[in-house]
Every structure is written in C-alpha cells, then in structure tokens.
C-alpha cells in the first residue's frame, strides 16, 4: 500500500474536476482518457508511449471520494477534504507495482508547480 497526502492551493471543486473530467485528466495524467463516472463505470487511460490501463469505478462521492479498481490488480482511492491552504488530497493505492502511484505523484507535483 502506498499513501500520499498533497495539499493543493485550489478549491475542492477544481481539484475534483482535475481528477474526474477526461479533458482535465489529459492535462496532467494520461494522453487519452475515457471515464464513465458512476459505480461500475469503465475508465481507460492511454499514454503516448503505448501504455494503456483500464479500471472500474468503485465509489463516487462528488468532491469527496473516488475509487478505481485497476483491471490488472489493485485499487486507487482519492479522498478530498478542506484544508486551510486549499484542498487536501489523500491518495491510497494498493497495487503490486508502485509505478502508478509514483507517476501520479510526479504528475500532481508538476500540475501544481507548473
């Protein structure tokens, strides 16, 4: 399990959009994104290097929590909460390989710091 907390200097609504809207996800996570944002919905992420990952949406609580189950094992859970400096994002990933969590961390830091 990998757990990471990051505080973003943006309102919760804006961070939620960055995590759930395909166009916003394409700004910082993957090159092509499709998400059916409802429990049981499908999600797919494609990168320019040819890598592709698929997931199923497990939980959706707008502006609070989003959980995906990766089709190749593991889950990733995003939990948002208010923070004096903006919005706190807690990412918990349970997956045999650490690559997704580490990629997410690097992308998130780039997104915040431009």
Language model features with spans:
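Hydrophobic-ligand binding "helix-grip"
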Residues: 34-39, 44-96
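Residues at helix-coil transition
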Residues: 20-21, 30, 62, 103, ...
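Aromatic-glycine hotspot motif
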Residues: 1-7, 12, 77, 82-92, ...
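Hydrophobic ligand-binding cavity/cleft-lining segments
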Residues: 1-34
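Generic macromolecular interface patches on structured domains
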Residues: 25, 35, 67, 108-111
């Amino acid at each position: 399990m990998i757990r990471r907390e990051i505080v973003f200097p943006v309102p919760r609504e804006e961070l939620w959009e960055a995590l759930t809207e395909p166009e916003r996800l394409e700004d910082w996570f993957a090159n092509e994104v499709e998400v059916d944002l409802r429990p049981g919905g499908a999600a797919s992420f494609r990168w320019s290097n040819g890598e592709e990952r698929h997931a199923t949406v497990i939980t959706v609580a707008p502006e609070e929590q989003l959980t995906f189950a990766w089709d190749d094992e593991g889950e990733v859970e995003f939990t948002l909460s208010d923070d004096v400096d903006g919005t706190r994002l807690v990412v918990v990933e349970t997956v045999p390989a650490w690559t997704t969590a580490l990629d997410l961390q690097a992308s998130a830091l780039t997104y915040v710091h431009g």
